[in-house]
Amino acid sequence: MNHSPLKTALAYECFQDQDNSTLALPSDQKMKTGTSGRQRVQEQVMMTVKRQKSKSSQSSTLSHSNRGSMYDGLADNYNNYGTTSRSSYFSKFQAGNGSWGYPIYNGTLKREPDNRRFSSYSQMENWSRHYPRGSCATPGAGSDICFMQKIKASRSEPDLYCDPRGTLRKGTLGSKGHKTTQNRCSFYSTCSGQKAVKKCPVRPPSCTSKQDPVYVPPISCNKDLSFGHSRASSKICSEDIECSGLTIPKAVQYLCSQDEKYQAIGAYYIQHTCFQDESAKQQVYQLGGICKLVDLLRSPNQNVQQAAAGALRNLVFRSTPNKLETRRQNGIREAVSLLRRSGSTEIQKQLTGLLWNLSSTDELKEELVADALPVLTDRVIIPFSGWCDGNSNMSREVVDPEVFFNATGCLRNLSSADAGRQTMRNYSGLIDSLMAYVQNCVAASRCDDKSVENCMCILHNLSYRLDAEVPTRYRQLEYNTRNAYTEKSSTGCFSNRGDKMMNNNYDCPLPEEETNPKGSSWLYHSDAIRTYLNLMGKSKKDATLEACAGALQNLTASKGLMSNGMSQLIGIKEKGLPQIARLLQSGNSDVVRSGASLLSNMSRHPVLHRVMGNQVFPEVTRLLTSHTGNTSNSEDILSSACYTVRNLMTSQPQMAKQYFSNSMLNNVFNLCRNTASSPKAAEAARLLLSDMWASKELQSVLRQQGFDRNMMGNIAGANNLRNFTSRF
């Protein structure tokens, strides 16, 4: 079966006129004659050269897909427990030795796995322009080249070379004698891209092997390149170049030419070919082209700078060896240096896209945080957001929306790293600008703006372990409260005040909020909570919804005052339970998981039980009744639902009775027996049924279903049978 050629390098929705994103390709008939990949590229170049003009691009406010991020099971020593299990994703579950308690900390660390990191890719709109001989158009400033210079950003695509990664979940069982509940927090990262063009069949990739290719050490670059200023008299027209004979080796040779025209031509050809052919990336690596392209970032000619940045952007996409080689050749610092001093929008697009691509590799994040974070924040994020602290003398240059989108995509990746997360929290103006942008978009009903998703995912990540890593007013209040309880209980060894502190069953005055929050104080401020809830109520993008719920999930995941205060703020003051409960109806399992985990966290606080009852109980029991369990998130969803029901039913047993249907109880019972494939959900279901049996008001519901002491003993398990029977 012959496939039609790929006729576009960009997502259709990026432009109102699709012609702006097309390459000049041979006819379909020619494509079916079996020409080689190299011949096809050369034919495309020659046909594009003959174009007389190209239409200008439309707005760079690109729409993009609703993909959520995957999970990365990185080792984390949170609470210093943990055993790792792996199914379709990585899972880490912390278990203590509590007899009847369930996890008091079961957090998700959401990071960007390689195969779902969405980073910018670039492709030339028209590889070159044709001008009649002898009548070359006058080039723009800094240009002496007559072919088309404009580069467009194409849809972001996932890395195809790495296996899917999953959640990092951790939890500990409560200490013996105390019934505790699970805490969940989540950690989010990258996913930003646009939908693929469905109207155009895609040519099969030229390199589909998942094995890492063997790379030849790159050739050292000639450091004696000439970077002279462009000369108008040296202009050449594109038809003077023998494009039909251009190859990757010749293009790499062009990079070392002392003529800037040939430098740009070589870089553009590499950029164009690497978009078409994955194997070209390895060839450029072997020929030492990366170091030459990095050197060209220092060229005084803007066309050469733009071409080199675009070529590097495509070279590093999906290629870890090329990313590492770019770093080794000092490419990160050169790119950051050029971004700091360049005022060209097109160059800024290429450089921020390059940095976004590089940021998906963990080995590069530390250097990117150190070098790129200041420039991205000061030159892109703060100016575009419109935020100002009133004392800043920072220049307010106009920033293109696509540059902002690329920059937030890069920071979205960097925020997943532990060191990067803390550095980003402390960087002046970053959180303020991200929050200002999200709030402005919500106020303007632009909740599905593509950059809002990136900003929310950054804020989600920066909220991870906030109570443990950032000094907050809650921590100071909790410290003072603990000292007060310790002094009062020092005369007796049987006081339960310490238990109350651990289980959040105490009343303490919550700290007053800052009138004008700054930096990390924004992350737990009521204005931020209100913004997240408003966004959850208005956005239709699954990734944005998941990020909002994940940020709230992180804020409610601790065992102290912050979780209590945030839960009350969300559920009572801001009346956010309806928005959260609606997440459980989503068709996206990532969204359902985040919503269910957030409700599980909030249900730990008795002060919320009454308000949560009728608003949450119907949706949570519906999950236990109808959830099919056929997704990778099913175990987390079902275990969260069991814990939420368990918490709420103890304080409102009569209300709970009306929602305990036969089908729900049968599903929970079957879940108890499914210990092999869903151990966490089975444990949560077992604890739910055990507490129902222990309740005088609810035991009758189980008896009506045919449950008896022997059956409940079997559910408890042989090891726990003695403890179980002793409770009745």
UniProtKB/Swiss-Prot annotation:
GO terms for cellular component: cornified envelope; cytoplasm; cytoplasmic stress granule; desmosome; nuclear stress granule; nucleoplasm; nucleus; perinuclear region of cytoplasm. Residues 48-69 are annotated as: Disordered. Its main location: nucleus. InterPro entries: ARM-like, ARM-type_fold, Armadillo, Plakophilin/d_Catenin. Changing residue 143 to A: Abolishes phosphorylation by RIPK4. It is found in: Nucleus; Cytoplasm, Perinuclear region; Cytoplasm; Cell junction, Desmosome. Expressed in undifferentiated keratinocytes of the epidermis at birth, expression increases as differentiation proceeds (at protein level). Expressed in the cervical loop during early tooth differentiation, expression is then present between ameloblasts, at ameloblast-ameloblast junctions and in the stratum intermedium during pre-secretory and secretory stages of tooth development (at protein level). ARM repeats lie at residues 244-275, 276-317, 318-360, 361-412, 413-443, 505-536, 537-583, 584-629, 630-694. Disulfide bonds: none annotated. Residues 54-69, 117-192 are annotated as: Phosphorylation in this region is required for cytoplasmic localization and protein stabilization. Induction: Induced by Ca(2+) in dental epithelial cells. The keyword Nucleus applies. The modification Phosphoserine is found at residues 4, 119-120, 122, 143. Disruption phenotype: Knockout mice are born at the expected Mendelian rate at a lower birth weight and whiskers are absent. In the hour following birth mice develop skin lesions in the absence of mechanical trauma, and die within 24 hours of birth, average lifespan is 12 hours. Cell-cell separation is apparent in the epidermal granular layer. Skin thickness is reduced in the paw, however normal on the dorsal side of the mice. Reduced number and size of subcutaneous adipocytes in the dorsal epidermis. Desmosome number is reduced by 90% and remaining desmosomes are 45% smaller in the epidermal suprabasal layers. GO terms for biological process: ameloblast differentiation; cell-cell adhesion; desmosome assembly; desmosome maintenance; intermediate filament bundle assembly; negative regulation of mRNA catabolic process; positive regulation of cap-dependent translational initiation; positive regulation of cell-cell adhesion. Phosphorylated by AKT2; required for interaction with YWHAG and subsequent localization away from desmosomes to the cytoplasm. Phosphorylation of Ser-119 by AKT2 promotes PKP1-driven cap-dependent mRNA translation and decreases intercellular adhesion, phosphorylation is promoted by insulin. Phosphorylation by RIPK4 at the N-terminus is required for its role in differentiation of keratinocytes and DSG1 localization at cell junctions. Residues 1-287 are annotated as: Required for interaction with EIF4A1. GO terms for molecular function: DNA binding; lamin binding; RNA binding. SUPFAM superfamilies: ARM repeat (SSF48371). Pfam families: Arm. Belongs to the beta-catenin family. Part of a complex that contains DSG3, PKP1, YAP1 and YWHAG; the complex is required for localization of DSG3 and YAP1 to the cell membrane in keratinocytes. Interacts (via N-terminus) with KRT5/CK5, KRT8/CK8 (via rod domain), KRT15/CK15 and KRT18/CK18 (via rod domain) as part of intermediate filaments. Interacts with VIM (via rod domain). Interacts with DSP. Interacts with DES. Interacts with FXR1; the interaction may facilitate the binding of PKP1 to PKP2, PKP3 and DSP mRNA. A component of desmosome cell-cell junctions which are required for positive regulation of cellular adhesion. Plays a role in desmosome protein expression regulation and localization to the desmosomal plaque, thereby maintaining cell sheet integrity and anchorage of desmosomes to intermediate filaments. Required for localization of DSG3 and YAP1 to the cell membrane in keratinocytes in response to mechanical strain, via the formation of an interaction complex composed of DSG3, YAP1, PKP1 and YWHAG. This is Plakophilin-1. The gene is Pkp1.
